[in-house]
Amino acid sequence: QDGGYMRIQQSGWEMKRDLDRIPWCSAILTAVNVIVFLACQFYGNVLYAQGSFSILYLIRNGEYYRLVTAMFLHADISHLANNMILLYFGGEIVEKTIGKVRYLILFFLSGICGNLLSAVYELSTGSFYESIGASGAVFGLIGGLLYLVIARKGRAASISVQRMALMILLSLYSGFQSVRVNNAAHLGGLLSGFLAAFLLCHVGRLPGERARRME
């Protein structure tokens, strides 16, 4: 009986360990984006009209919720796929390194800051447009990952500073090749993600967060 109890207990620990390895936040955020995209195939006109972001919606109507809702809308399958691949696989590393609470703060803060810089760009140029997509938040994860790589003596999860820099430059370059890409949101997300990662890695334990050890 004792042997059976020990085997069950050990099996429970192994299951918990396996569950802890799953990047739940990245997985859930990816799933939500996919579900919303599928919903847009049926209710796209309503969702895009009510969820896309532009500074005009903030100034005229005070619809600040659009800073967040626009992050979960995508124009087409390639737009969604590009963002979700980076969100899941890049986010997985960040989430496992800094924890779920910090990860969520980093993700949403970067997305919001990306949209805010986009708003500043609209005001400064007088060119107003509606924008959608999670790329501001995704670039925030890339910026956060860049900080983690630098903070860990130039390498984290087999990713070097050189590889990170090349990935960022290629991503930004491809964005500037298209007039449809919101590069202001990309830059805003990237910079805020880097800064947020620095700040989040130097604060104490957050509410709802288990004790952890930073390597």
Where are these regions (language model features)?
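A detector for small-residue-rich transmembrane helices and their helix-helix packing motifs
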Residues: G3-E215
